[in-house]
């Protein structure tokens, strides 16, 4: 049995490592208990500065992109379902028979889905995503971030199978989409969380933003495939037109699942939940492009475990029981002001949807028709292309501007373009010039959303919470995002039919509220560790 020797951290904290661990930078036997610990994450500013400038981030960036691929299936569903439900073969397969009587008293039989059926098929996905995010994302604490994503991919494939085997029964198709949504909902929590915990310290914000980039890429690819299928398979009996997007879902899930094999597990999960410190050291070193023997690795582990070491002396049975009771609702009752952090996270997620972005993707088709672009498939490709290309810039600006600044700057620009859109649409005459203005404003709105609110929302929310409550807190925030997504997609057509472009003023009011809310309550989390964020909520 190897002897234990203390290692003196620069802050005065002593961690107990084995002598062979200090020599080799790795080991298997640690005398560390990691139960009921409080989180003390890395000091991003200080530690990132200490990492060698020679550290190569090519492999870490590639591995982060692999993690972010988990968002592709989310975008793929968004990009394919709208076009699928409009395909003639889809309507013939799942619709009910309608008898049409023309002027010459000839009866024509067609099959068509009702608006209610289409609404249920599309919106059930949003509801089930919210349910999956809220109820099953905790699995990431039980079997790891990677294991949780693999579980979600299996659920996703089961949902695809149900849809393919629905045999023309729209309610079975809806059930399949519900199961698929549960799987996707889990990924919307675990993928940003995994990215936040595994990204190189120097570029964490940018790497978390790649999740939104991959989502928009999935939307674009789905739109392009729909366009190809609609052009190539016009015969109502050619079910391959709507089945191909579903079959490809298997391929994406397999690619994502196999790629994750090469990604190390989250160092926070390994060290603080699984109690596997050697693997945590390896993970941190690999994802920051430094050797496992680098002093930064030891310092990072020390920072993760410091609070646990300080709490070991009070680790008796009665206090264990009190901690268990406390931890049940710690995400609300914990300090410092975790309830306020949860409210901030929920509001940011809600405001992302209330910005009106999905209104543009829904109503943009009508605007493009005004200048002769009447094909909804082409319109979708144009809008999703702007969204994807702009998100690439967002990866840079989220890190450059800072998270709160990005939120304020983005919402201010979105407010301007939403007001312009609503005013021109409401009071402008229907001319080619006004339609061109509306198209330009639409693209500008999507551009500013893609470089600010789109990526920064998940980055900021993922950094608000300590590790001990991050899973449940992010699950609740993501659930709110999905519920507002569902409500807006459900209510927008009805509201537009009543007040038309004036709906833009409602979204503008929400954006103004976001600016005020962000200015007063949202903290700047860029390059701040948990202790620094704690001081913001409880100033000493």
Swiss-Prot record:
Pfam families: Sugar_tr. Residues 1-56, 141-146, 199-204, 265-357, 399-405, 462-478, 522-540 are cytoplasmic. Keywords: Membrane, Repeat, Sugar transport, Transmembrane, Transmembrane helix, Transport. The chain crosses the membrane at residues 57-76, 120-140, 147-167, 178-198, 205-225, 244-264, 358-374, 381-398, 406-426, 441-461, 479-499, 501-521. InterPro entries: MFS_dom (IPR020846), MFS_sugar_transport-like (IPR005828), MFS_Sugar_Transporters (IPR050360), MFS_trans_sf (IPR036259), Sugar/inositol_transpt (IPR003663), Sugar_transporter_CS (IPR005829). GO terms for biological process: carbohydrate transport; hexose transmembrane transport. One of its GO terms (molecular function) is galactose transmembrane transporter activity. Probable glucose transporter. This is Hexose transporter HXT14. It comes from Saccharomyces cerevisiae (strain ATCC 204508 / S288c) (Baker's yeast). The gene is HXT14.
């Amino acid at each position: 049995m190897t002897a234990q020797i203390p290692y003196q951290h620069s802050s005065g904290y002593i961690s107990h490592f084995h002598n062979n661990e200090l020599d080799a930078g790795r080991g298997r036997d640690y005398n560390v208990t990691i139960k009921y610990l409080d989180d003390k994450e890395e000091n991003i500013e200080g530690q990132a500065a200490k990492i060698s400038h020679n550290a190569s981030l090519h492999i870490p960036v590639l591995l982060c992109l692999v993690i972010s691929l988990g968002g592709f299936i989310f975008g793929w569903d968004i990009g394919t379902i709208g076009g699928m439900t409009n395909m003639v073969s889809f309507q013939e397969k799942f619709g009910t028979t309608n008898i049409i009587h023309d002027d010459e008293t000839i009866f024509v039989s067609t099959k068509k889905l009702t608006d209610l059926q289409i609404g249920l098929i599309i919106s059930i996905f949003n509801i089930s995503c919210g349910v999956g995010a809220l109820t099953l994302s905790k699995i990431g604490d039980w079997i790891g971030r990677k294991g949780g994503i693999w579980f979600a991919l299996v659920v996703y494939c089961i949902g695809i199978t149900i849809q393919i085997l629905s045999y023309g029964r729209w309610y079975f198709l809806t059930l399949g989409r519900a199961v698929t949504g549960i799987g996707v909902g889990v990924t919307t929590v675990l993928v940003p969380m995994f990215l936040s915990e595994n990204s190189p310290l120097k570029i964490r914000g940018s790497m978390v933003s790649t999740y939104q980039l991959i989502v928009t890429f999935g939307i674009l690819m789905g739109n392009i495939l729909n366009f190809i299928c609609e052009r190539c398979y016009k015969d109502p009996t050619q079910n391959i037109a709507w089945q191909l997007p579903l079959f490809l879902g298997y391929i994406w899930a397999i690619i994502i699942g196999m790629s994750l094999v090469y990604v190390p597990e989250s160092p926070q999960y390994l060290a603080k939940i699984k109690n596997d410190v050697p693997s945590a050291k390896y993970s941190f070193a690999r994802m920051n492009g430094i050797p496992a023997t680098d002093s930064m690795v030891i310092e990072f582990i020390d920072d993760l475990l410091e609070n646990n070491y300080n709490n070991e002396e009070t680790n008796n049975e009665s206090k264990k029981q009190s901690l268990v009771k406390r931890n049940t609702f710690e995400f609300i009752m914990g300090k410092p002001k975790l309830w306020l952090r949860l409210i901030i996270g929920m509001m940011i997620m809600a405001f992302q949807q209330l910005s009106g972005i999905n209104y543009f993707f829904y109503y943009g088709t009508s605007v493009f028709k005004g200048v002769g672009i009447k094909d909804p498939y082409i319109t979708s490709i144009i809008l999703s292309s702007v969204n994807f290309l702009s998100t690439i810039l967002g990866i840079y600006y989220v890190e450059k501007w800072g998270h709160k600044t990005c939120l304020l700057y983005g919402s201010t620009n979105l407010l301007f373009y939403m007001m312009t859109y609503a005013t021109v649409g409401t009071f402008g005459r229907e001319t080619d010039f006004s339609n061109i203005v509306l198209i330009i404003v639409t693209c500008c709105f999507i551009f500013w959303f893609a470089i600010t609110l789109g990526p920064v929302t998940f980055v900021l929310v993922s950094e608000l919470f300590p590790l001990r409550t991050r899973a449940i807190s992010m699950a609740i925030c993501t659930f709110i995002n999905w519920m507002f997504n569902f409500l807006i997609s459900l209510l927008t057509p009805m509201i537009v039919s009543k007040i038309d472009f004036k709906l833009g003023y409602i979204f503008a009011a929400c954006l103004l509220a976001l600016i005020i809310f962000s200015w007063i309550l949202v903290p700047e989390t860029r390059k701040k560790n948990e202790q620094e964020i704690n001081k913001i909520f409880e100033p000493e």
